[in-house]
Amino acid sequence: LKIAVCLKRVPDTVAKIVPGPDRTSIDEAGLKFVLNPYDEFAVEEALARKEKAGAGETVAYAVGPDAFQETLRTALAMGIDRAVLIQTAGSPDGLEVARALAGELRSGGYDLILFGKLAVDDYNQQVGPMVAELLDLPCVTSVAHLEIADGAVTADREIEGGVEVVECRLPAVITCDKGLNNPRLPALKGIMAAKKKPLEVKPATLGAGSIEVLGLELPKERQAGRIVGEGPDAVPELVRLLRSEAKVL
């Protein structure tokens, strides 16, 4: 199998996010970035499939500025064979990212193209399906179990109230959900080896995109609640507060 894994660099999920000076992007000063957690499932699935087959190649792709090299090195440390950074300036929208990825993947001869189900910074769930559409490939999203046999995949995806089982032929695009596997941690040996693995940087000029961010702001602080008492004796005070302060009565 020849497998591509498409990755994104996102702020650490425990980091405190604040708007930047321009109020249209986040302030990255002192902010820690990590490999998108859902993409870890995609990396692990690629590695496990190669190990099970006993042969093949795994390639990681990312679209973004030079700082994305660190994210790709994380995938290389986990065991990915080589990586490609489609280097861009700014923050292209999902469609521009999908077009850039599709342009690179089209001639790669990949049997399987893996994405995380979503990126935790924007929750759009767009890029994987758009790449599939641009490449005219079948796509199964939010996959929690995957089987490959005889040139076809059988995928389980959790839906509200049950599990949907989908079959399609290879090549295919799969977006990976929690439960698909348990991502490995990079070992020291892998971290050292990652420094010597190929990481190709391909400068690219993307379009302006069709989405404009007008502004970012933090949610307004809410006033803390108040406990007015318990039982029937608290009802008059509660009614008074609802009428005089909350003004909902």
Task: For each feature predicted by the language model, list its residue ranges.
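N-terminal glycine-rich FAD/FM-binding segment characteristic of electron-transfer flavoproteins
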Residues: 1-249
